[in-house]
């Protein structure tokens, strides 16, 4: 099960050949070099490069303005119209590698933020009149820019009133539910507290805006340039690429502590179990970091420093030492010396449990995979394929009779790993076709004849299962190896690859690193020739969902690539053929039609669509409270959905996992939270009954499998 290297060689050859022939950059500033590198890389390797013309200019203008003023609460109509004069000139500037529109827009943006902050500081301390019959439009697309500063001030008053109303009514609801547990406060006191909370939130908001650097805004701009070509082509600064690699690989070199901003300081939000900081037994959750010292180097007072700058000070190579000066809960100040090391992040990693319904079903393994992670940069890095195989083997050791692979909310990741993982369930054969600019598609094959698991298999998906999740679901559906259950998936049928922009420009070493561009270089196709682009994977068995009547997924993007198809390839497998999909779907449909919670989910989906279409909200306290109470009354019957544990469902940790779970109270708590959600999951309950039906109906499964799958 190995990734075909030929495609990588072709793509990289084209990339380097193109750049070796490039003339000297027109604009040799760092920003100019980055822009030059992005655009030349697009032309060299993007699946479908577009010309830099008026369409580009118009699209970039709309996207960048939306990033600068997402709620239309900063710019006035006159300022917007002033910027709009550049709407069809940006392409000329980009082709010349100049930044006139960018310069003008950030100048106006900074000015408008400063003005908005002043308005906020003046208005938040004035009394708010909630007796007026006025409304606020919450949909940005329906909003108009304020005509002048007077109208802008009115808009800010509405924004503040809306936030205060939301906070105030939430506090009143909490008071009604918890009167015996909390100090009883008057309605006026709750309103005052709501104003204080909103004031603090906006102060923090303006503080974050004030910390934005030119480089941050340039990253937004370069992202808009990249996004024009398709939604998944994007620019990554060196720091963003580092964070992406950590997220994908689940591993970093540092101290193993999660940090968050706390006023002027940085707080330890959690210490990673098993990491260097945890091993010292000195650094604790909620410690406030005051200073950071590299051993043998200078001490840096981090008061007022941006969180990402603090993170860069704390991270470092394995074996190096950092000293944190922290303030404890008792206000004592201590120095904590920590030797950096590799840190394994357990968040998002594959994990499994055993499911039983006594008298109905026995020993069904459940594997949860939140993302297709892989560590390319670090030696000994994580691989989700390896981890899933580990979970399969652990389940087999405990006599598993069926496996459920849960890919709900899994947005994808490593193509290599999904090819390997799909191969665990078939003998050998094609997994996915990928096609770039070349005429001929490339096949990613499972070349390993061994089968890691040959029993009953169900894959759970939803509308947020994307990319790699869709590859494995589509392949095993086409092979009739598994039943796919859930909702139509996201519909991302494209492949991206990172390109280091330092390699796109010769010389200029003093300005590097320039960052990376994540580029769409291929589409992937099912073995039957179809594509998941826009359409997603349609489940064999569809279950009700809250988002049924709302557009979710790739089709939401205006610049999404189109659906296409190519010729199918020959494929077959003899491990286990699922032949009773129609019968299984009918049995599930019958159960769903009688299941009170699924019926409520269908009803709730209609309500969600109706509420989404209502974008005008009253700012009169009586009207707002009445509206909220009506919503709560309408939605009260939906509260029972996935609130209680499923009757008779027994979920057990695997014996091999117990030692790790019990090594720390945090691990115990995280495990209990994981199990708690599963115990209430009616989708999982229905999948268990689908598994039972499948084992009973399918001839592929042996008499012995049918026998041991039934509880005695």
Give the residues covered by each predicted segment:
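Cleft-lining beta-strand/loop regions that shape enzyme active-site pockets
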Residues: 4, 22, 26-27, 44-52, ...
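Hydrophobic membrane-insertion alpha-helices, especially the h-region
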Residues: 5-18
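Extracytoplasmic/secreted envelope proteins and their assembly/folding machinery
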Residues: 32-39, 53-65, 80, 87, ...
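Acidic/histidine-rich, surface-exposed loop or edge segments in extracytoplasmic proteins
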Residues: 35-47, 85-89, 200-204, 370-373, ...
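Extended, small/polar residue-biased N-terminal targeting/export presequences
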Residues: 52-58, 65-139, 206-261, 321-323, ...
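PDZ/PDZ-like domain segments forming the peptide/carboxylate-binding groove
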Residues: 66-67, 88, 105-118, 126-169, ...
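Conserved functional hotspot residues or short segments at active or partner-binding sites
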Residues: 123, 142, 146, 162, ...
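Polar, glycine-rich mid-to-C-terminal structural blocks
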Residues: 468, 480, 485-552
